[in-house]
Amino acid sequence: MKKIALILSLVLMLAACGAQPAETTAPAAATAPEGTCAELVEKLYENVPVELALMTETTETSLSDAEMFAYITGLQSNEGVADVAVSMPMMGSQAYHVVLVRAESGEKAAELAQYLFDNSDMARWVCVQATEKQAVVCGDLAFFVMLDPQYGVTTDQLVEGFTTVCGGAVDAVIK
């Protein structure tokens, strides 16, 4: 009887050790929404839970004028950029700047988001300075915002609104 129990336990141990591990899957990458960058920024503003205390203007930025592109977006090159829109105050020195870039790939979007986060001048305005900044990657989109929250909105609120535009999931948030 002891031999049967020993053999049975040995067989069970071998079966347990030889079992395949459960398959794990990486979370699915976020899918960027359809539309131009300017249209997506407008959708963002529909989702922001507070009304901006700024008169902002969203403009599509030309990829052909390299100097203006760099000045408006903060990017040094339009390499790998398919579309871009910028939203900022129409007048005055108010620390508020949103950049949305559709890149040629998700990898390029992540690279652009990190570049904007690392290299944007938070004191680019006369007499004012942004105190918050964040960047987000959603599929082939790179979203960047820097601002002074005294204008009635925070970067967290805008990132939350952008996440909603992206269907509730993003690939990365850089703080």
What are these regions (language model features)?
Residues M1-L8:
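Positively charged n-region of N-terminal signal peptides that target proteins for export
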Residues G106-A113, G152-D156:
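Short, conserved charged micro-motifs
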Residues A113-Q134:
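An anionic, turn-rich surface loop/hairpin at beta-sheet edges
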Residues A95-S105:
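A short acidic-to-branched-hydrophobic micro-motif
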Residues P33-P89, A109, Y115:
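Surface-exposed, low-hydrophobicity interaction/linker segments
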Residues L12-A16:
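C-terminal motif of bacterial Sec signal peptides marking the signal peptidase cleavage site
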Residues G18-T25:
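Bacterial lipoprotein signal-peptidase II cleavage site
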Residues M90, C127-I174:
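A short, solvent-exposed beta-edge/loop patch
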